[in-house]
Design a protein with these regions (language model features):
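Inter-lobe coupling/hinge segments of SF2-like helicase ATPases
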Residues: 1-134, 138, 142-146, 164-166, ...
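Nucleotide-binding motor/catalytic cores of P-loop/tubulin-like NTPases across gene-expression machines
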Residues: 151, 167-172
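Short, intrinsically disordered, charge-balanced linker/junction segments flanking boundaries
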Residues: 178-180
């Protein structure tokens, strides 16, 4: 229902509800001083996204969730359920240690040549027809190859490939990554 999440958050904030169950959305931008316990289920799910920033996003989300507990007079507690308790982003988030996370993440980024140690651009192509998308993708790939040969030999091309969600609302999608 329209505005239902605002009503639920308001009821929780006003003390009309003692337990709030929600998605990632509730950890951002809300201040509930009486919250003393935060539980995060399947905290490692975002680690498996096909995105080089997956560990960073997991770390951020867990730190934001942990920041919801103990904001008022009473101390807070955070319980994290995970299938990857040895993952560096989970460990660093459990300590809320940004330096610990960065030290591990920057090693990974350097090894893989990902930002901030390299430049990276994603080119998302979308068309209503699958055959049109294939033709457009081939044209873009040829253009990229031509530019690479003429000016940017150090350019590394990944793809084209299907993105994690390759069709949305009858729109077909392809993605190409460029690294330098």
């Amino acid at each position: 229902r329209k505005n239902s999440h605002e009503q639920i958050l308001s009821a929780f904030s006003d003390g009309e509800a003692d337990i709030l169950v929600g998605t990632q959305m509730i950890v951002k931008g809300h201040d509930f001083p009486d919250v003393t316990l935060v539980g995060v289920l399947a905290a490692d799910m975002s680690l498996y996204a096909s995105d080089y920033t997956a560990a960073e996003k997991t770390f951020q989300l867990l730190c934001q969730a942990a920041g919801r507990a103990g904001r008022g007079k009473n101390p807070g507690e955070v319980v994290i359920q995970t299938y990857a308790p040895d993952n560096y982003s989970i460990i660093a988030a459990s300590h809320q240690d940004y330096d610990e996370f960065f030290e591990q993440e920057i090693v990974y980024r350097k090894l893989m040549g990902y930002p901030p140690v390299a430049n990276m651009v994603s080119v998302l192509l979308q068309c209503s027809g699958e055959s049109e998308l294939e033709m457009a993708t081939e044209s873009v790939v040829q253009l990229i190859r031509k530019v690479k040969e003429q000016k940017y030999n150090e350019l590394f091309v990944i793809g084209p490939a299907d993105p994690p969600v390759s069709k949305i609302n009858d729109i077909y999608r392809k993605i190409i990554y460029l690294k330098s």
